[in-house]
């Protein structure tokens, strides 16, 4: 597994260190993300990833590349309310199933995650759920209700409150909240 090929843009947090490129696609990740995610995929070997919040698509591309490098068959479904033109090419190449719609049932946050995502999580084998959309706390709480034993749920860019963000995270791990 060659983690070195994933480049970081910007020499420090004040210059977007939290933005990296993967095959020319931007991913809003800090420099520790590639190794952490690669180790997770290699050690857990999940059957699928549900990504809530595609953003620019770089992290999705990274999941596909790592899964190919470690010979891991992996289904990836990713949701975002914004669709970029390059998602069509990535979907045609088999990177992921890009779904341009709300993760919420009928688009209503209070309704919980949509049934198709619940069905995806409940399939046999380990599912990794990455909560990285616009309401991580709600995404996490709603998706967690549907996890099977052994499934993993992650929240990206999460801080429990502004004080923790200001004192422990801002300028140290990432610089956005």
Which ranges hold each PLM region?
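A short alpha-helical cap/connector motif
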Residues: 1-177
């Amino acid at each position: 597994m060659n983690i070195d090929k994933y480049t970081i843009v910007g020499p420090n947090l004040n210059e977007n260190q939290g933005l990296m490129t993967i095959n020319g696609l931007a991913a809003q990740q800090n420099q520790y993300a590639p190794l952490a995610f690669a180790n997770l995929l290699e050690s857990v070997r999940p059957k699928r990833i549900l990504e809530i919040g595609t953003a620019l698509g770089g992290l999705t591309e990274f999941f596909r590349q790592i899964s190919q490098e470690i010979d891991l068959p992996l289904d990836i479904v990713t949701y975002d309310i914004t669709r970029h033109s390059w998602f069509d090419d990535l979907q045609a190449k088999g990177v992921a199933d890009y779904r341009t719609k709300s993760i919420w049932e009928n688009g209503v946050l209070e309704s919980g995650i949509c049934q198709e995502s619940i069905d995806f999580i409940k399939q046999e084998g380990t599912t990794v759920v990455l909560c990285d959309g616009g309401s991580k706390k709600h995404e996490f709480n709603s998706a967690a209700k549907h996890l099977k034993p052994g499934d993993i749920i992650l929240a990206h860019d999460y801080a429990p409150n502004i004080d923790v963000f200001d004192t422990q995270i801002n300028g140290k791990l990432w610089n956005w909240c």
